[in-house]
Amino acid sequence: MPVTHASFPCSVLLLCGGRGQRMGGRDKGLLEWRGRPLIAWLHEQVRPLSDDLILSCNRNHERYAHYADQLVTDEDQDFQGPLAGIRAGMAVAHHEQMLVLPCDAPLVDRQLLEALLAHAGARPVVVRQGDYWQPLFCLLPTALKADLEQLWQAGERSPQRWFSRLAPVAVECPIDDPRLANLNTPEMLAAASLSADARES
């Protein structure tokens, strides 16, 4: 049976707050891919999962508001990385679990999301490809926000280092899993579009 927010309440955080340096400073979540903004592809997948959809963004708030129940912004406008967005999201999340995804991964599918949700518990659940963890594809118990706040105040800014202290549960994915592709350069956007067209033809 597919997971829905009626059967498994969770918050969802979509991270849209980066500088977009590889995209020439453009806001990645609003870049068009196959006729729609990148954020729209993620929204389509996660909207049925939650009544608490949070977007972390530092600009273009009016455009992002269409895709969220809540918008959060980093306290510091100095772009301190994705952990800042996770911290802001955890501070306002309504549910005991929070699903986290980056805005530039439009190939994420329901099967991957359900695999993360199926392992919900007291520890973070994080995608792993071989020996490499993908810390921005994860499910976090919001009870960990005090632990995160303590480390943040001590200067920690790496999601990877934070998770490593918490014995995360792994959701194993192949090294070349296309669902985890971050389309964060113009070349990657174009290549992924061609690949998707080829699969559909």
Swiss-Prot record:
The EC number(s) given in the record are 2.7.7.77
Origin species? Ectopseudomonas mendocina (strain ymp)
InterPro entries, per the entry: MobA-like_NTP_Trfase (IPR025877), Molybde_CF_guanTrfase (IPR013482), Nucleotide-diphossugar_trans (IPR029044)
* Main subcellular location: cytoplasm
Q: What is this protein called?
A: Molybdenum cofactor guanylyltransferase
**Protein location:** Cytoplasm
Q: Which family does it belong to?
A: Belongs to the MobA family.
Keywords attached to this Swiss-Prot or TrEMBL record, sorted alphabetically, are: Cytoplasm, GTP-binding, Magnesium, Metal-binding, Molybdenum cofactor biosynthesis, Nucleotide-binding, Transferase
Which reactions fall under this protein's catalytic activity?
A: Mo-molybdopterin + GTP + H(+) = Mo-molybdopterin guanine dinucleotide + diphosphate
Which coenzymes or cofactors are required? Mg(2+)
